[in-house]
Amino acid sequence: QRALFSLENPTTLPKEGLPVKALNDALLSDVLFIEIRPGWQSDVPLHIVSIGCGDHVGFSSKIFVSAGENCHVDIVESHAGEYGSTYFSSCVSNIDIKAGARLGHYKLQNDTDTSTHLALTQTSIESDAVYDNFVMSVGGILSRNEVRSFIAASGVECCVNGAYLGTSNQ
């Protein structure tokens, strides 16, 4: 069975049933590629910051992560907005975790109270690898964080957690 995607051929993602991805593809404005070498380990997380600003604008980003065999790294994503601004944010993350790798992926979605945030995280996880995901959503009039994982072999640990803190008219 084929993984959801590959960095070598990112077009292998299915189009059906992925409306956030389809919208992201249509509006794509920024792409980030992160390749973590096999065996590389870090106690310091990689921090990706996305700041929305301006009124009635939209931006769309895509993140590709390839975690090499037996590497160990944490990635933190922070999404925030300029106070008072109203915008639309779409983010798709494609993460490929090779055999024996450990990847922590933690996201704080704290956009403005009048903004919309749609996100999709897709992972492909190989044998004896670990993927730990946590999403905290505290901002936005509307927010969606979808996580899909393809477990490609045995011995995989995949942990997906999240929390929403709704206030006012969210």
What are these regions (language model features)?
Residues 3-170:
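Conserved beta-strand/loop scaffold segments within soluble protein domains that form the structured core
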